[in-house]
Amino acid sequence: KRLQAKRGFAEVDIQVSPNYRLTLLTTHLKSKLATPEADEEEMREQEALLLREKVDAIFKATPDANLIVLGDFNSTKDSRALRSIIGRGRTALVDTRPAEKNGDDAAPANPRWDPAAITWTHFYGKEDSYSRIDYILLSAGMAKEWRRDGTFIVRLPNWGVGSDHRPIVAEFAAEEGR
């Protein structure tokens, strides 16, 4: 059965200066709510493959593109959908993995996994669970300009009044001529 993506992708090219351009590619993949048409996880996987095709087309046209892929992926880090979007090899995207600024300043024992970092971005009331399903992914070029210390999950009082997601902030220092 062929299904249509309910939400598309938004692509925005930003000419920061005459010598610097970046592309934002945003998404909101299928929610976790069950649908009668198909399995929602499979639907997200198919949407993720379409998004990765778009990422690959950008890299084919501009191999050193300054690309940021972001949004509500409705998928955890180990899902096939997210792995498809991140990709492999030269065009693999970098996960910024933002965390709350909660005062912890000890270096993690393993830099790839920091158990003290609070990284959840979404509360799913039906399952009473907190998870990270919102992402900011970067091309290799953007990753070089990414400021880790300026990237975090915003912690606000009453955050859940307006949304079941928490905002993410990422900071970059653009290099001219890229």
Predicted features, each with a name:
Residues 4, 13, 56-68, 75-178:
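Metal-dependent phosphoester-hydrolase catalytic domains
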Residues 15, 19, 44, 68:
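A surface/extracellular/periplasmic glyco- and lipid-processing/surface-interacting theme
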Residues 1-29:
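Structured beta-strand-rich core segments of catalytic domains in phosphoester-bond hydrolases
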Residues 31-34, 178:
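A short local loop/turn or secondary-structure capping micro-motif enriched for an aromatic residue
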Residues 41-63:
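A long, amphipathic alpha-helix that forms part
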Residues 1-2, 33-43:
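Acidic/histidine-rich helix-loop elements
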